[in-house]
């Protein structure tokens, strides 16, 4: 899956989780198309469920690339899968950026999605995240909730869809019982898929759409790519040999 034309710049490889939902796959492709309009060649790879894998894409490119892990928290996929895929590709001219989230830009997009779903100031918000067994990812989710809370002006509770406790329906019920307010779920997911579909049964007064294709998200990806390109240039300018330029930045 490739978007854009060859411009002589490093290709961007957008790495997502993967989903069996055709709508989710189409959304990731559409996001790549929007980013490609600004940065040129953009490839999509997946670490699970479907292909191509990051290593397959990077081997096929056999050229400098900037990899953006399109994950909203830094768990196993970011710390283990992505670096392993880069190493397995044999492509030494790869720069891996930090994970996409958490980021204040994503919090702003979440707020926009909430408003689209009918949320109003004074309504309670539950942030629905996929979940992880990695404490670092859970810390990232808490940071994301804090960023969203700064924008809503109220506490944002956290519920998990797949891994971890408490589960989203339980949090929604508790918040409603304690506050007596309407409760909306902010979907801290990139695209539609199994996890987002589960939120329909959470018992909330409204469920926001996933982050999806949004102008601010596109600009964030473009910014991450350009920072990655600059890092490649700095490394090359320092006199590193071409086959020793692989660099994986520490995740946040």
Regions found by a protein language model. Name each.
Residues 1-252:
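Active-site-proximal alpha-helix that buttresses catalytic centers in soluble enzyme cores
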